Amino acid sequence: MEKTMEKIVALAKARGFVYPGSEIYGGLANTWDYGNLGVELKNNVKKAWWTKFIQQNPYNVGVDCAILMNPQTWVASGHLGSFSDPLMDCKECRERFRADKIIEDYATEKNLTLEGSVDAWSHEEMSAYIEKNNIPCPTCGKHNFTDIRQFNLMFKTFQGVTEDAKNTVYLRPETAQGIFVNFKNVQRTSRKKIPFGIGQVGKSFRNEITPGNFTFRTREFEQMELEFFCEPDTDLEWFAYWKQFCIDWLQTLGIKEDEMRVRDHEKEELSFYSKATSDIEFLFPFGWGELWGIADRTDYDLTQHQNVSKEDLSYFDDEKGQRYIPYVIEPSLGADRVTLAFLCAAYDEEEIAEGDVRTVLHFHPAIAPVKIGVLPLSKKLSENAEKIYTDLSKYYNCEFDDRGNIGKRYRRQDEIGTPFCITYDFDSETDGAVTVRDRDTMEQERIKIEDLKAYFEKKFEF
């Protein structure tokens, strides 16, 4: 069975995971809406992150910061000055491209090895490589490009009724800066001592020139970010700790070792303020793609905001009698990307018998959009089956389905990744028990109706 993006996208659209945005108006490029199953899947992924990184973690607390911030925030963070992509236009067809992506795609196609990360190359080095290899335009095939120039990725808008420079604001390109500007507030009100972390889940916006690969790279996206504040001399220990914590989280939820890899950034790739950066990548059907960036950002962010705002963002360690700017370890995860990764990892086609193939999504029960399908064997049994549905839906997202052949109903639940199906049959009327079917093994066992809640509590532990 070949796992392709075409199959996964088709299933996602057909079953209500993801729809094209604004579809009845012809759509809007690179926008996607999460459907009835997609919103449950993504919410479960976010909940699983929040549970392990915030709720169950003694170090960390959460915030939810505004999307619009004082523009000085982006001066301090460097986004207004340097948050940009190297772009060039084809003079023949007038299409615009990222120079680094053209080089990377060409090298992949020709099976060539590049020296270091293209991100670290200068404009001159990129231009020289494109000229030397006579790389053609991906759209028209000609080789006639403009010079490379930088393009800022921030979405600009205006606050209030007047569209002038004084009212200019930006849609945040990351959630992290809201955490940094609230460092003192959170530390004071939570009474946390270093080391501690602040986490946030929220929307961010980047005016990407080459978005694509379904929901992998979009202009509007959701992030799950943690900023972990620590003593300057302990940063590399915490960097290693959080890197392993992130790997464990992914593997616990079903990402296999051979589907992921950790890529440590070379020295020349690192941002000037970073001591270490690692990317956790997932093997999508279209190739390796970054899910999680873990960075040792040193004291850069708090120092920058302290310098621009003139507010003291240092921390006084009363046990050591020292005052310092904390270092920051940042594990930054894309909610849309990791949701897509879980969807790709879960997708499978199994040959049950000759010519009989079932499509199944092997989601971890904690993130499955529907936890339990309640399926009465006959419509005559629907009333009592609905009572089971009503009781269990207080605790889990359940689906009730009494239409059609029971075998076809099982297959539909397999396709949407439902871990367990309850079949209420004619024997249930007399013995007070139901058949519970396991999605992955397709094995069935008889469980007393009164024991179902306790039975599923064990199954859905995370």
UniProtKB/Swiss-Prot annotation:
SUPFAM superfamilies: Class II aaRS ABD-related, Class II aaRS and biotin synthetases. Its EC number is 6.1.1.14. Pfam families: HGTP_anticodon, tRNA-synt_2b. It is found in: Cytoplasm. GO terms for biological process: glycyl-tRNA aminoacylation. It catalyses: tRNA(Gly) + glycine + ATP = glycyl-tRNA(Gly) + AMP + diphosphate. This is Glycine--tRNA ligase. The gene is glyQS. GO terms for cellular component: cytoplasm. Catalyzes the attachment of glycine to tRNA(Gly). Homodimer. The keyword Ligase applies. Keywords: Aminoacyl-tRNA synthetase, ATP-binding, Cytoplasm, Ligase, Nucleotide-binding, Protein biosynthesis. InterPro entries: aa-tRNA-synt_IIb, aa-tRNA-synth_II, aa-tRNA-synth_II/BPL/LPL, Anticodon-bd, Anticodon-bd_dom_sf, Gly-tRNA_synthase/POLG2, Gly_tRNA_ligase_bac, GlyRS-like_core. Its main location: cytoplasm. Substrate binds at residues 98, 174, 221-225, 330-334. ATP binds at residues 206-208, 216-221, 290-291, 334-337. GO terms for molecular function: ATP binding; catalytic activity, acting on a protein; glycine-tRNA ligase activity; protein dimerization activity; transferase activity. Belongs to the class-II aminoacyl-tRNA synthetase family. Gene3D superfamilies: Anticodon-binding domain (3.40.50.800), Bira Bifunctional Protein, Domain 2 (3.30.930.10). PROSITE patterns: AA_TRNA_LIGASE_II.
